Structure formats: C-alpha cells, structure tokens
C-alpha cells in the first residue's frame, strides 16, 4: 500500500500536509491512531479524478463514457469480453483478453443509502446468471451518520466519520451527549437507533462546533456547504443525522490477484469480495483496498500477457443475439431480481429497523 500512495502523490493527488510538508493523518471510527491520509472531505473524489486524468493521457486507452455493460461474453467458464449499451441505445460486443468488473455496490436497492441510485448490484446479477462464485452477500454495512432528509428518493449525504474523528459529538433530543462517537460502525449505528427509539425521533444531532473553526473550514468544506444548502449553519447549530446503507463488503469472490472463479474475468472495488474487510469494514480502508487489489489484477494480467483466442472468442460472440438485450427495462428488471436474490434482502451490520426497511424496499 505505501507504493500505491507514492503513485498517487506522483500523479498529483493533493493530500493534506503538515507544516513541515509531511502527510497529515486523521482518525475515524474504531481506528486506534491517526493513520488516514485525506483531501478535505472528498478523498475518494480526489483519488478518482487524479487517476482519471492520468488515464486520459494514455494513447493506448480508449474511454467510452455514458456506456453500460449489459452482460459478459463467456463460453465454457471463460470470459471473452462484454456486451455494452452506448448512450444512443445501440448494443455492441467488445472482445478482450481480460475483462474487469468494477460496477460498485448495491446501495441503489435500499431506500436509504449514500450510494448513487444506479448502483443496484448488476455485477451480482451477472455473476448469478453465469455461475460465477459470490462471497458473503449478506455483508452490508450501515454508516452511522448521514444528513437526515425526508426525501427518500435522494442519495443520502454522508457526514464523514472523520468529522467525529476530529471531535464532533452526537447528541440526543435534549442536546445531551449519549455515546462514544468513535465506536465501530455497527455498534454506533445500534446505539443511535436505540437513542432514536428512546427519544421518539427520526434522527439524532451531530455537533461540529467542538471542532476548531479553521479545521472545519479546511477539512470539511463540502459538508459545510451542503448543510448550508439544507438550512443549517454548522458554526452555530447541530445538524440532524441518521444511519443509512453505505458499503457492500460481500460481492463477487476473488483471490488475492482479484481474479474471479471465471477464467480471464477479474473484479475490483466494491464489486469484489476479497475478504480483507471481514464483516465490518474500517473507515477509509476501502479506498486503499480498491487501489491495491486493482494494481494486483493489472500486474497479473500484464504478466500473463494479452493474447486473445480469436477462434474461441468468435464462437462465444457468435452465440449471442443482441436482440435478447434490446429491451433495456426488461434487462434492468431481470438484473434487479437476480441481485435481490443474491443478497436475499439481508443486511448483517445494522439494526432490526434498518433490516426491515431494506427488505421492504427490495421486495417493493
């Protein structure tokens, strides 16, 4: 992982620094020490935008934006590429020596989630369809603090765990502190739910005024701005927060090189389950894990060589009728059903109320 961080810095990733120029570290829930490098309150965005800028410089890479993977091309448990749908709705078959699935998680299946709504577990559906092994599909994590809103259709806005790592306090309806804010996510989520039930409220309060103003402004500008847009001034008052689905620790089973049970098919990021997070991921570990295991996948593919069996690939592609995928809505319904079957409406790291709301939404 130190090499990955060095790579990012060399690409221009702008991580926070101390006065002496060394990397600054913050702390989040269940971490024993300050060990997390960061960029304001949008570290993930900084990493992805930096990597994307580097990719755009590569002459041997073709970026196809607004393009959706509809299915993989496979024959005899070997992947030969993917079927894609372009922005204008046209379908194409793309062959490849190796295919990597990086489809995100399952948050779009839940009523309350920090994920984008289009992340509905398509990789799980494709895996089930083609007999690719899955692992721990019930390992779904709840984040303790997202901004409370009555608009259920919106993506829940994350109030970063590092806010609590820097000193923010959680308060009940009477503005009394009721919990250790740096408990592991599952434990803290349970405590918040218990307090909400006790108070008869839909949220608890988070007070950021315990953080020095300069630190708030430099570290959490996006949170400050979002709260302002929602009518709250974090410098003068607490904000309402509530737990929501956040991260999928299960997924397509992969080995330590991110290879799936299907030959020439890899999976990375939230799509994959390599087991390193166990049942309850530590905050921010997923960013580094995604990069480390993606780099391992790339390294193995380069080592094995990019040689495609054109005859076998042709047989695989010829067996596919694109007309089977012409009804986009029908494909979406099929994949949502398969993804739902994969996770079975389960959610292991949360509370009874969250489980019931998740299952109710999935079954709707």
Label for each model-derived stretch:
Residues 1-15, 129-140:
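Conserved FAD-binding subdomain of flavin-dependent enzymes
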Residues 7, 16-27, 31-34, 164, ...:
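Glycine- and aromatic-enriched mobile tails/lids
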Residues 9-90, 102, 146-150, 170:
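Conserved redox-cofactor binding core of oxidoreductases
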Residues 15-18, 63-65, 101-102, 134-139, ...:
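General beta-strand structural signal in soluble alpha/beta enzymes
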Residues 64-65, 70-79, 83-85, 219-272, ...:
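A glycine-rich dinucleotide-binding beta-alpha-beta segment and adjacent secondary-structure elements
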Residues 98-151, 157, 287, 291:
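Glycine-rich loop(s) and the adjacent beta-strand/alpha-helix scaffold that form part
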Residues 126, 132-237, 300-306:
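An anion/pyrophosphate-binding glycine-rich loop and adjacent beta-alpha core
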